[in-house]
Amino acid sequence: NRVPYKSAPETEAWVSDSIDVAKALGCKNILLAFFSAGDLRNDPAGKKEVIRRLKKVAPKAETADVVLGIESWLSAEEHLEILSAVGSSHVKVYYDLANATKMGYDIFKEIALLGAENICEIHFKENGQLLGQGKVDFERVKVSLDNIGYKGWYIMEGAIPKGMEVLPAYRQNLNFVSQLMKS
């Protein structure tokens, strides 16, 4: 995020190299984060350059069968505009529930709009709260994801209350997610 993909020349090689590394490790998804200096909100020139760069590297991702996942502050509609412009089945959205909620997006409509075919992974996250104790309605999220037929990864992230140690927090988060997935 300090060295933005939208403007730093060296990031083109980094993303290209990350495809080789992911393939060698057997990883299917690469997270491309667009925050801080890399933020694409209100930046048409930045979006245009990201699209240009992704179009250039997408064939390599396709050959390697590795997905480049965009995580950003953008809405589902804006993400779909980028995906459509790039035109590759190997460029998708790495959807972060807490970020989208923080932005005021209707995450249930966004999930339906994106569809399973455009989401590579989901961040289960509550900023500063344990999963299920913050603003995200995970029961509705699960129903929404089931409705679109999402079968990908769920990644627990950033769900630790201030002052709580990581291991106990993630044990509780894992228990919450396990129970949620059984419902």
Residue ranges of model-derived segments:
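Active-site acidic/histidine proton-transfer and metal-coordination neighborhood
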Residues: 1-93
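Histidine-acidic metal/acid-base catalytic patches
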Residues: 26, 76-183
